[in-house]
Amino acid sequence: MTATWSVNKKIFLQNAITVKNNQPLMAVVKNNAYHYDLEFAVTQFIHAGIDTFSTTSLREAIQIRQLAPDATIFLMNAVYEFDLVREHQIHMTLPSLTYYYNHKNDLAGIHVHLEFENLLHRSGFKDLNEIKEVLKDHHHNQNAKMIISGLWTHFGYADEFDVSDYNVERSQWMEIVEALLSEGYQFDLIHAQNSASFYREGQILLPHHTHARVGIALYGSRPYSSLNQHDIVQSLTLKAHVIQVREVQAGDYCGYSFAFEVTKNNTKLAVVDIGYGDGILRTRAKHEALINGKRYPIRALMMSHMFVEVDGNVHAQDEVILYNNDIRIDEYTFKGVGANSEQLSAMNHDSLKKEYISNDC
């Protein structure tokens, strides 16, 4: 038996349609589409009516171009392979004044999106004056030059409700957008909203915006806990099997380095064929697994195995669910296991069997 990572294609597609809510989305497909597989995700998103994509990798951007010849593809990281960016008609961020002045000749013919730094401080122009400096210099540049097609930022605090930072970054951003538009500047694409912001705004675009740039919600995880589970549906299942059930006694230690001390006689431990080598985070192993519709506590994690404390209703060959729509990735995000994307990224697709299921089972 081999632990299996599987995605229900119909549920994945329907979730994307529901998330889109008839709004223009830029689907974030970075890191191999959150490890759902880039080709699979792009194909499904196209079926859902999405024709604009973003990633952080030039290699992935080129792959998307091969999959979607007519799509708009936005590269969120600045790169230096300018000929490749031009050749594949990829849009790219313009991250700073320094980058602009160092490479404005290299950028000739490339579509760029001016990036506002905002509270995240990861990349971008620091204020309106820096953005206008580029716009003015670009206007007076008589040489072959870049094409300013977009304006964007990233909200780093849209999933935080106990602080005012989202309102601050949203307000600062809207002031930038409205100031530029009021001075007659025009942009084909204006985008800022991530999944959390998109849902906080009622699944509609902010004023003047052309797209919401949505990632994790498209993959079936809620960006914050107060959202109803029915609003975003997980299509992913991660399952393993019980190899055998062992009976242990009070005082026994099970697992490496005294991982679990047994406190009751005749305790039953299911040995399950999945472990941290398959991508189960140690923080996830502090919680439960689902067997025959019931949750049981995980007691120890090893490279290729785990111990789950069970009862007499669990037997060899029973399925053990680590994730599905009843025991969701986002549930464990909110319990502190790790970000949705962190749990997805940890899974080892070289050791897990991968399946894409075409029906509702």
Curated annotation (Swiss-Prot):
The keyword rRNA processing does not apply. The active site is at K30 (proton acceptor), Y256 (proton acceptor). GO terms for molecular function: alanine racemase activity; pyridoxal phosphate binding. GO terms for biological process: D-alanine biosynthetic process; peptidoglycan biosynthetic process. Keywords: Isomerase, Pyridoxal phosphate. It is an enzyme of class 5 (isomerase). Catalyzes the interconversion of L-alanine and D-alanine. May also act on other amino acids. Belongs to the alanine racemase family. This is Alanine racemase 2. It comes from Staphylococcus aureus (strain NCTC 8325 / PS 47).
